[in-house]
């Protein structure tokens, strides 16, 4: 797992970390609810979030909350996991790795309503890119809505380039750009 890091913004403490498929089940529900609002049918979904954390990677920014005494272990499906109610979801990125182990695909990047425009996705994206490069990934790909100017700006700033327009990628008239980062 990647090493967690923390930062402070407006007197709040935020942590960037990789999710654990056994210990972070409560956050799975938050991610699915959030992504359903943001991406609709394109969200990671309740059946896919756990395999993403187990066989891919899911990184989050969480806001650390004040009442730490509410941490407790909870039994679920004969597995014990930590119910971390001392944090709330801020941003999330899901990643898949290709069969060619030098390629990774960023499935989703999003920030919870109320936290947009504060730099959380930018910090998380930088953390994830550093992590991928340390894993000897040489190509990172993602798709983005053709009209999503904020996301395109973030990705271009990180070194991504638009490779092609994918017409009807997610259905009729739902076009996306394929963007790629290639290690130099």
Where are the language model's segments positioned?
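Conserved glycine-rich acetyl-CoA-binding loop
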Residues: 112-126, 145-153, 157
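Conserved GNAT acetyl-CoA-binding A-motif
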Residues: 132-143
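Acetyl-CoA-dependent GNAT
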Residues: 11-114, 125-127, 131
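C-terminal "cap" of GNAT-fold acetyltransferases
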Residues: 5-7, 145-149, 158, 165-184
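Structural motif
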Residues: 135, 157-158
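Eukaryotic N-terminal low-complexity, Ser/Thr- and Lys/Arg-rich leader segments
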Residues: 1-11
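Short aromatic/hydrophobic contact patches that present stacked aromatics
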Residues: 108-110, 141-143, 178
